[in-house]
Amino acid sequence: MAEVIWTEPALQELDALAEYIALDNPAAASHLVQDVFDKIERLADFPQSGRIPPELPNSVYREVVVPPCRIFYRGDEKRVLVLYVMREERQLRVYMLGGC
């Protein structure tokens, strides 16, 4: 079982997104955060289960999609490092992940 580690920027982005959603619908924001954490925790057992981001076909990064979020991570059998969270409709910039 891999250890799931959230980076500070990933947590900040998720928090900012949840705060924005909560302005109109606090219950939806809470539900989204819970869904994201549930989906990411599954990576502890299956670290390679996320898809390879279409924008980064030859990279070590993977992503999990929990609408409206894309959650980017790197992982192996020992550790899953959650790196970045963004809204699905935003364009991914490679520098957001620290380069490839």
Provide a role label for each language-model segment.
Residues 66-70, 74-100:
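Enriched for short, Lys/Arg-rich terminal
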